[in-house]
Swiss-Prot record:
InterPro entries: Bifun_inhib/LTP/seed_sf (IPR036312), Bifunc_inhib/LTP/seed_store (IPR016140), nsLTP2 (IPR033872). Expressed in most tissues except nodules. GO terms for biological process: lipid transport. Potential lipid transfer protein. This is Probable non-specific lipid-transfer protein AKCS9. Residues 1-33 form the signal peptide. Gene3D superfamilies: Plant lipid-transfer and hydrophobic proteins. The keyword Signal applies. Keywords: Disulfide bond, Lipid-binding, Signal, Transport. SUPFAM superfamilies: Bifunctional inhibitor/lipid-transfer protein/seed storage 2S albumin (SSF47699). Disulfide bonds join 34-68, 42-56, 57-92, 66-99. Belongs to the plant LTP family. The keyword Signal applies. The lineage of its organism: Eukaryota, Viridiplantae, Streptophyta, Embryophyta, Tracheophyta.
Amino acid sequence: MTMKMKMKMSVVCAVVVVALFLIDVGPVAEAVTCNPTELSSCVPAITGGSKPSSTCCSKLKVQEPCLCNYIKNPSLKQYVNSPGAKKVLSNCGVTYPNC
């Protein structure tokens, strides 16, 4: 086998390996639209200390990637950092972000 042929085989093998990794990646994550009003169902639990509804928890889980943006927003920071919000996050099984 010539050197040129070995080089071509190496390139083909590398392409096949990369293709196998790409095939196994799975579905691409959908982008989340960050909209704090989606969390309005959580307000009674945050402000009143009641148990969060299943709607609240499901919305929190969808909006979880947005929490750091909410914390960085001066208008929303006080609500997301409140003890009530932290309790709701915990009750819903959503980890408080470390931004």
